[in-house]
A protein has these predicted regions:
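C-terminal motif of bacterial Sec signal peptides marking the signal peptidase cleavage site
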Residues: 7-10
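Sec-dependent N-terminal signal peptides
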Residues: 1-5
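Fold-level signature of zinc-dependent metallopeptidase catalytic domains
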Residues: 29-41, 46-55, 140-387, 391-395, ...
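Structured alpha-helical bundle/scaffold domains in large eukaryotic membrane-trafficking regulators
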Residues: 78, 212, 443-446
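Extended, compositionally biased alpha-helical segments that mediate assembly or anchoring
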Residues: 489-543
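Bacterial signal peptide processing site
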Residues: 12-14
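N-terminal helix-rich structural modules
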Residues: 19-192
């Protein structure tokens, strides 16, 4: 937290905020202010009815409140006062992108004066709580997704549900969702909005997740609520608020629908012993492409998501599967602004042609599909994989999704189910994608997963680096490395092997000197690290 913070109540209610003294950029951060390229999030809404446009406007209003909630979870200060304390426009925008004074793509290092280190537990836990104290304590909803940990009047650890801690904001969001439902032409979508509103009020999201899985034909969609646990870097238990407002691309979605049918067969063929692949993925899963028109909260903080795989609820996944949403317009923006120039800088000339948008789209898509494969519950009664691996669960799951995604592409290419591109395209584009993603920093779940995979592949000769710092992919060795790393990760997950994962991350989750040098060359070439958005009702022409 900022040393100069105003007074706040324990549950994030910022009614007693005092003005903040002005802060300024640390000198060493001057060169990082331009690492985000601004992209306009627009879409053709001409085919939407008047009611659908009214509904979109309301969904964006609900998302704005979600955005404020995530500021409270991530930073804990009053957003308006904090941003007003920054006089420089570019620095203020950088702080807005990062949802606070810490650089999300540089290990959460502070970039403003008078700023202390970011707590690994963000605002989900008391600032004075140690990890050991938490683990020894006994209290209700200790590992809960949807509650804050705080101290009671006796100084003991206890929890308060999100619906109570943020009651005003939650109720406002719920009312807006219910109003939006009255404008929905699609009955299933109207039902989902109403059930989601109820879920926000009572912190029980399973029924709304099931309702969301039943939606197949609605052209408008929204992902909203406390969903991912990446912001909780202390334990990975508690979920951050986020929202995406989406327009379905019907023609692209039709192309993708066939892949979900292969999930059971691909699960059976995983390169690991039978006991680690006994779970049967839900057969009601679907795969669709969308243009995203609004990001809010966690999804908008720092690096931007370009694909979604939800719900996270293991029971819903086993019963219904998951929905994989490919955010096509955001994906294209990243490919053009970042992937192409990275390939021209770090890939050998003869393989640059293998870096294609088709492969980038597929790698991203099958990463999300692969979240539905593998194992959700340990084989030795340690509970779910997520519970047993604690703060390492997210990083290992991201690594699993990457390597199993490549495994799936290889299998579907061999069956001619995928007819575009070659294995060399997908592998070379994947390697280029590691360079893109690792610039997000090695401290995040995705960053650790990137480094574990990069260093593992390097050890197994999947790619080589020449004296000029240019990389080339060895297709045969990459294939072998993908299968062996897949087996290793699935076994660590199935065994709930926290210590084994800890050792793997400690050994391979680091950036080596050569890679650091290569990443510096991308900075020297002024290639953006990620994108940020010009978005909202005005951009879309909505009232």
């Amino acid at each position: 937290m900022l040393i100069i913070a105003g007074t706040l109540t324990a549950c994030g209610d910022n009614k007693a905020v005092t003005p903040l003294a002005s802060v300024s950029l640390l000198p060493e951060y001057q060169d990082r202010l331009d690492i985000y390229k601004t992209v306009t999030l627009s879409a053709d809404l001409s085919q939407l009815s008047t009611n659908q446009k009214k509904m979109l406007s309301l969904l964006i209003e609900a998302s704005d409140i979600i955005d404020d909630l995530f500021w409270q979870q991530a930073f804990g200060q009053d957003k308006t006062s904090f941003l007003a304390s920054i006089n420089d426009d570019k620095v203020r925008e950088f702080a807005r992108i990062n949802y606070g004074p810490w650089d999300r793509l540089n290990g959460d290092k502070a970039f403003l004066t008078n700023t202390t280190a970011k707590s690994p537990g963000a605002q989900f836990y008391p600032a004075d709580m140690s990890k050991a104290e938490f683990e020894k304590a006994t209290f209700d909803d200790k590992n809960g997704l949807y509650s804050l940990v705080m101290r009671n009047e006796n100084g003991e650890l206890s929890t308060i549900a999100f619906s109570e801690a943020y009651s005003d904001e939650i109720n406002r969001i719920a009312v807006i969702l219910e109003k939006a439902a009255t404008f929905a032409d699609n009955k299933e979508f109207a039902n989902y909005l109403n059930i989601r509103a109820t879920a926000l009020r009572n912190d029980d999201f399973q029924a709304s997740d099931l309702a969301w899985m039943d939606m197949k034909n609605n052209p408008i969609d929204i992902v909203i609520g406390p969903i991912e646990t990446y912001e909780d870097q202390l334990f990975g238990y508690r979920a951050g608020f986020e929202s995406y407002v989406l327009i379905k691309d019907m023609s692209w979605s039709e192309k993708l629908s066939k892949y979900a049918d292969f999930l059971p067969e691909l699960q059976r063929g995983l390169p690991v012993s039978e006991k680690y692949k006994a779970e049967i993925p839900g057969s009601d899963a679907d795969l669709n492409a969308y243009d995203v028109i609004y990001y809010a909260g966690h999804s908008n903080a720092g690096g931007k998501t370009i694909a979604i795989n939800l719900p996270n609820d293991e029971q819903v996944q086993l019963e219904k599967g998951t929905r994989r949403l490919q955010l096509k317009n955001a994906m294209r923006a990243k490919f053009d602004a970042i992937m192409t120039p990275i390939a021209e800088t770090l890939i050998v000339p003869e393989q640059r042609k293998n870096v294609t948008f088709t492969a980038f789209f597929a790698n991203t898509m099958f990463h999300e599909v692969a979240h539905g494969l593998g194992i959700k519950n340990t084989i030795n009664d340690k509970g779910t994989v997520r519970q047993s691996l604690k703060e390492h669960a997210s990083a290992l799951e991201e690594g699993k999704a990457d390597v199993l995604g490549l495994y799936m592409i290889r299998q579907l290419l061999a069956k001619n189910v995928i007819s575009e591109g070659t294995l060399e395209d997908y592998y070379t584009t994947f390697l280029t994608g590691i360079f893109r993603s690792v610039r997000f920093g090695a401290s995040s779940a995705h960053g650790k997963a990137n480094m574990v995979r990069f260093n593992y592949f390097a050890e197994h000769g999947a790619f080589s680096r020449d004296e000029q710092g240019l990389y080339s992919v060895n297709v045969d060795k990459m294939t072998i490395a993908i299968d062996s790393l897949s087996e290793l990760i699935l076994m660590l997950q199935g065994n709930g092997d926290y210590d084994g994962v800890d050792k793997l991350v400690a050994k391979n989750g680091v950036i080596n000197p050569n890679l650091a040098k290569d990443l510096a060359s991308l900075e020297a070439a002024k290639i953006p690290v990620d994108i940020t958005f010009k978005q909202g009702k005005k951009v879309l022409g909505l009232n």
